[in-house]
């Protein structure tokens, strides 16, 4: 009985340390993988063998590291090299640029690129969701509500849009009473 409490304490502490160790190793592994990919892409760029997708991937790596300026520069290079007949790819690229501008709170530029994405893929729900987020962030609740209604036109069972719509409707009703 006298050994049970110390045993449980040491076991619990060991489990916590094991979880921390696994987390640290997974973080190191993912960083290492991203850095190796970064080196590989930069080598392609130095050898002038990079295409739009390589610059896009490089931008995504910088975006994940929160280096937004470098990400935007690489996304713009990707835009210049991207195949114009790849509508889905262009929509994704424009959406990613818009997302990057959203991260640095440049909402006008973000909306510009989101609108460009919708020109290529009008029913791109991720872009519509991002536009709705910006309208909410800028307190343009009526436009946000319209965007979430538009999402529901394309995907009737979209739980995110339904929840946001219910929330916005409540806020708009409450604001009308004030």
Curated annotation (Swiss-Prot):
GO CC field: chloroplast
Transmembrane segments: none
TPR repeat windows: 52-85, 91-124, 125-158
Subcellular location, record wording: Plastid, Chloroplast
Superkingdom, natural source: Eukaryota
Keyword entries, A-Z: Chloroplast, Plastid, Repeat, TPR repeat
InterPro entries tied to this protein: TPR-like_helical_dom_sf, TPR_rpt
Pfam families: TPR_12
Protein family per UniProt: Belongs to the ycf37 family.
Protein name: Uncharacterized protein ycf37
Gene assigned in the entry: ycf37
């Amino acid at each position: 009985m006298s050994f049970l409490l110390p045993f449980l304490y040491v076991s619990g502490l060991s489990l916590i340390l094991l979880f921390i160790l696994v987390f640290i190793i997974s973080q190191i592994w993912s960083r290492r993988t991203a850095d190796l990919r970064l080196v590989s892409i930069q080598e392609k760029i130095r050898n002038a063998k990079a295409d739009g997708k390589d610059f896009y991937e490089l931008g995504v790596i910088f975006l994940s590291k929160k280096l937004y300026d470098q990400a935007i520069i690489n996304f713009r290079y990707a835009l210049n090299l991207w195949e114009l007949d790849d509508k889905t790819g262009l929509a994704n690229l424009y959406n990613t640029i818009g997302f990057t501008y959203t991260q640095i709170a440049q909402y006008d530029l973000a909306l510009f690129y989101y609108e460009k994405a919708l020109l290529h893929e009008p029913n791109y729900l991720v872009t519509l969701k991002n536009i709705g987020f910006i309208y909410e962030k800028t307190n343009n609740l009526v436009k946000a509500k319209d965007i979430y209604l538009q999402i529901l036109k394309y995907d009737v069972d979209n739980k995110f849009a339904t929840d946001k719509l219910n929330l916005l409707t409540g806020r708009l009703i409450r604001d009308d009473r004030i």
